[in-house]
């Protein structure tokens, strides 16, 4: 019955780990095609579907091309091959390609692990120089090593004529190799991100005292950082001025490829460390002060379905609850349904507890037989596989309502940045309310509870990994577990991993079940939320805040220019479309965005005068320095492959330059402005003039029948995002969209009875 109704589907598709070398290594230049390998390379089929097609069995990588090559106009392909497969049988495929003399580039990823199956060591453990020597002996004439750290490789250890290039040059290297007439090899050297994380935790690999942060006031929300990194740790954050980006410090594996995004919002923190959570409570005293919950008797088998994201500890929750039940002498079975969970896919843990072991006859929870849904991820909690286990009126649900970014978000943002097309590649949305209603309907009225587990656990304990045990604590205190709190605490202790934090997370979950508002006050005091993260309550506040911002941006006269146009728009809308305010809101946001363009003066001001440095001080502690990653317009050299200006790192001294530049903003647009003749500033002025003319035309011809079109036209500035070449791409797409919509608007003006009130595609009114 739970599956008989249509569902709001937000897929949790497996994705490469944050910082995974595959995020970069599997890409190919525009116009080229790649063949997938096995293991993690296979995932490129859905993560890079326009570039990667077909796959083969282990050891057959690239071999189908030998048969295809004589019968196609395609001159060259790339074949992805892992170091594990290379050692096993991949060398035979390369040997066959050499004999066949086909134009192909083998990209051998040396990531030092059999990544997809858990990070086992590669048999043979061939080094980069050994692989280079081996393929040279097979007759490969063109070999290039690409790596995230060229200093690791000495030219003397490699065969003669094998260059070592930085991974930022990957596109240029591949363009060179695809012109090579025979078989070439690109050895991509970068350790598996998941394995790096494990080794750092165990002290087997240095953990660099360096973290990336994004100033979301400077961020334009263009997605170029996602295009450059393909990383799941670059997450969306909603602000009064639109959807921006942030770095999830808990999941970041310190790959730093996001720094290549063409944006001045990126800052690295070198030295110091993240501040600990606000309230890592002493376990013994807290446990003693909490009232004991009712323990479910489990007279019959009690089914707990844990639904979450791979790599976040879902399987650990199953193991802990299974251990705790065993400590109490109860019967228990735990079945983990993992699949591609290690790569950020969905994972389920089926936990069944009974008074005696002989009462348990199956490990898997059957359809409609879950007593408790512990939804550690709301997307997986709403999946068909999960809903099929629920029974209205019998199942209880405790669900983490915080959204964890999906692969679709990352890929959509990246595609927008690469193309500049926001009209066709729409901003991905997360229908939280619809998903919550779906889960609530599946379990019945009053039987589902939704808690911001990730936000609370991160604020309280400094790490989002604590969220799952926070949810366990909440369910336990609500009397939804057939296991005592003491046994769960003991199981956490026996597990031996991050004992203090995990026990504290469990106890904070229990406290939240007793008094959620009190826990909210501890986790998020009013001063912890930056003002720009607070969304306006109504249109008047939206306008007033932007008037204040424009006064700080330039001066009061500049702000009056904004307010005067808004007043005329509002009066016209009230007269022509009574009861409507969509046009006024669209202009309030769109006009502000074009007036407050983030030029050199504004970037300097946003870094120094808007609380960014103070927010950093609240998040980091110790002796740290700030490094800003910028491409100054007068100094940045273009990248020979992409044409984009290359970014450089600037130390903390640049803050003084920012402060001076911010104070000089009164020069903006005057004859003394050194930036006024740049291509970007000319574009800014043209866009502003054209938008003001557009709004005047919309206001003059506004009536109920064309109101929806007017709103869509006025909202177009939201589609202009980013800096430099990224912004220019977006502006060109927005211009073409404006031309199309304006033709229809004018046609409606000439033929007022033609078509009636148009219902357009939902306009992209992200806050800006």
PLM regions: where:
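Phosphate/pyrophosphate-binding active-site segments
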Residues: 1-27, 145-165, 399-402, 446-448
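Active-site diphosphate/adenylate-binding microenvironment
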Residues: 2-62, 71-72
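Thiamine diphosphate
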Residues: 45-184
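A short, small-residue-rich loop immediately preceding and capping a beta-strand
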Residues: 75-88, 104-108, 303-311, 365, ...
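Active-site cofactor/cluster-binding pocket
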Residues: 126-129, 134, 142, 268-306, ...
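Glycine/aspartate-rich loop-and-adjacent alpha/beta segment that forms the canonical ThDP
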Residues: 159-166, 172-228, 483, 487
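Iron-sulfur cluster-binding cysteine motifs and their immediate structural context
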Residues: 190-191, 196-202, 220-277
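Active-site loops and adjacent core secondary-structure elements that bind or stabilize anionic groups
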Residues: 487-495, 499-768
């Amino acid at each position: 019955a739970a599956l008989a109704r249509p569902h709001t589907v937000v897929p949790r598709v497996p994705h490469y780990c944050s910082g995974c070398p595959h995020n970069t290594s599997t890409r190919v230049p525009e116009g080229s095609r790649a063949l997938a390998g096995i293991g993690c390379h296979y995932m490129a089929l859905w993560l890079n579907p326009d570039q990667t097609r077909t796959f083969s069995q282990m050891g057959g990588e690239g071999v189908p091309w030998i048969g295809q090559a004589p019968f196609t106009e395609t001159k060259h392909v790339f074949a992805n091959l892992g170091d594990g497969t290379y050692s096993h049988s991949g060398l035979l495929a390369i040997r066959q390609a050499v004999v066949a003399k086909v134009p192909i580039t083998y990209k051998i990823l040396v990531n030092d692990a059999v990544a997809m199956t858990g990070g086992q060591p590669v048999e043979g453990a061939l080094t980069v120089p050994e692989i280079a020597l081996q393929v040279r002996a097979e007759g490969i004439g063109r070999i290039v090593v690409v790596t995230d750290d060229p200093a690791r490789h000495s030219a003397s250890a490699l065969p003669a004529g094998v260059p070592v290039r930085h991974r930022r040059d990957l596109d240029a290297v591949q363009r060179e190799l695809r012109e090579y007439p025979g078989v070439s090899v690109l050895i991509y050297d970068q350790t598996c991100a998941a394995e790096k994380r494990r080794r750092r935790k165990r002290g087997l690999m240095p953990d660099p005292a360096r973290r990336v942060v994004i100033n979301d006031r400077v961020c334009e929300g263009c997605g170029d950082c996602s295009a450059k990194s393909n990383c799941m740790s670059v997450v969306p954050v909603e602000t009064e001025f639109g959807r921006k980006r942030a770095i999830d410090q808990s999941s970041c594996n310190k790959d730093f490829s996001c720094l290549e995004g063409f944006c001045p919002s990126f800052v690295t923190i070198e030295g110091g460390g993240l501040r600990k959570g606000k309230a890592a409570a002493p376990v013994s005293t807290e446990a003693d002060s909490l009232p004991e919950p009712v323990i479910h008797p489990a007279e019959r088998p009690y089914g707990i379905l844990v639904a979450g994201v791979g790599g976040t500890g879902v399987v650990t929750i199953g193991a802990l609850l299974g251990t705790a039940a065993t400590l109490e002498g109860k019967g228990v079975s735990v079945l983990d349904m993992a699949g591609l969970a290690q790569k950020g896919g969905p994972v389920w843990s089926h936990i069944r507890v009974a008074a005696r072991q002989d009462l348990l006859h199956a490990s898997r929870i059957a359809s409609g037989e879950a007593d408790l849904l512990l939804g550690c991820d709301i997307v997986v909690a709403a999946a068909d596989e999960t809903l099929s286990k629920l029974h209205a009126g019998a199942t209880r649900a405790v669900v983490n309502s915080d959204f964890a970014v999906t692969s679709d978000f990352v890929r959509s943002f990246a595609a927008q940045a690469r193309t500049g097309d926001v009209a066709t590649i729409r901003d991905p949305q997360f229908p939280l309310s619809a998903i919550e209603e779906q889960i609530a309907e599946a379990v019945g009225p009053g039987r589902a509870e939704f808690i911001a587990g990730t936000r609370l656990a991160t604020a309280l304990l400094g790490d989002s990994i604590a969220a799952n045990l926070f949810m366990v604590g909440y369910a336990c205190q609500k009397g939804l577990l057939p296991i005592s709190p003491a046994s769960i605490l003991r199981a956490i202790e026996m597990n031996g991993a991050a004992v203090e934090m995990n026990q504290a997370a469990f106890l904070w979950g229990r406290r939240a079940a007793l008094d959620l508002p009190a826990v909210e006050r501890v986790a998020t005091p009013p001063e912890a939320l930056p003002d720009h993260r607070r969304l306006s309550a109504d249109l008047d506040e939206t306008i007033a805040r932007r008037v204040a911002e424009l006064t700080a941006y330039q001066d009061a006269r500049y702000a009056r220019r904004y307010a005067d146009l808004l007043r005329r728009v509002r009066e016209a809308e009230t007269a022509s479309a009574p009861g409507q305010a969509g046009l006024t809101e669209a202009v309030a946001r769109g006009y502000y965005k074009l007036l407050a363009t983030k030029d050199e003066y504004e970037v300097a001001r946003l870094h120094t005068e808007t609380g960014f440095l103070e927010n950093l001080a609240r998040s980091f502690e110790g002796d740290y320095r700030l490094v800003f990653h910028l491409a100054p317009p007068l100094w940045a050299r273009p990248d020979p492959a992409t044409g984009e200006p290359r970014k450089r790192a600037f130390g903390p001294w640049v803050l003084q330059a920012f402060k001076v530049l911010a104070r000089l903003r009164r020069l903006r647009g005057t004859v003394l402005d050194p930036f006024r003749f740049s291509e970007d500033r000319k574009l800014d002025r043209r866009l502003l003039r054209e938008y003001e003319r557009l709004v005047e035309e919309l206001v003059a011809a506004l009536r109920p029948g064309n109101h929806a079109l007017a709103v869509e036209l006025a909202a177009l500035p939201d589609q202009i995002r980013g800096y430099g070449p990224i912004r220019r791409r977006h502006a060109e797409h927005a211009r073409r969209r404006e031309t199309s919509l304006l033709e229809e608007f004018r046609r409606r003006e000439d033929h007022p009875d033609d078509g009636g009130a148009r219902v357009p595609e939902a306009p992209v009114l992200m806050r800006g």
